[in-house]
């Protein structure tokens, strides 16, 4: 997997907690088969502590292209998550550095990472190195 997807999409629908679930993505896919869609953000700890492989069920083959959005601030954990998520067949892995929600802020990810570019750089480096 590369950092930048080789494909060019005319429409990308940003991941939004509480909105871009499987039903919403299905509706958007009816509108456009070529839009880049994303899962809701999933925190790295949720992936690492979930043994049921729940996150490989967030999408279906007919939903593609779909990106998986990770939330976190620990480069090693995010790298491990990226390996797991990559095995599920998502078209892209996206690191959340824009979510302004209180949940993201309390976990030190999302928009609060704008003030920590060194951490973002380390996270992106680890993710791209190992996936």
Give each language-model segment a name.
Residues 12, 24, 77, 81, ...:
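General structural feature for long, well-ordered alpha-helical segments within catalytic domains
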Residues 91:
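Receiver (REC) domain switch/active-site residues of two-component response regulators
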Residues 84-88, 96, 123-130:
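Mid-sequence acidic-hydrophobic segments that form the walls
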Residues 2-3, 16-88:
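Glycine-rich, positively charged N-terminal anion/phosphate-binding segment
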Residues 2-11:
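Extreme N-terminal starter segment of soluble prokaryotic enzymes
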Residues 41, 45-47, 97-118:
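Glycine-rich, proline-tolerant flexible connector loops at the mouths of alpha/beta enzymes
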Residues 58-67, 110-131:
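Alpha-helix-loop-beta-strand connector modules within alpha/beta enzyme cores
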Residues 69, 94-98:
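Short beta-strand segments
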């Amino acid at each position: 997997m590369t950092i930048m997807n080789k494909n060019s999409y005319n429409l990308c629908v940003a991941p939004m907690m509480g909105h871009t679930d499987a039903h919403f993505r299905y509706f958007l896919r009816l509108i456009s088969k070529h839009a880049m869609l994303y899962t809701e953000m999933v925190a790295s700890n949720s992936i690492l502590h979930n043994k049921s492989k729940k996150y490989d069920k967030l999408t279906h083959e007919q939903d593609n292209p779909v990106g998986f959005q990770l939330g976190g601030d620990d480069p090693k954990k995010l790298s491990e998550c990226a390996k797991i998520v990559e095995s599920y067949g998502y078209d892209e892995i996206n690191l959340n550095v824009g979510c302004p929600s209180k949940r993201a802020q309390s976990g030190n990810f999302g928009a609060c990472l704008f003030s920590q570019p060194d951490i973002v750089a380390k996270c992106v480096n680890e993710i791209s190195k190992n996936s």
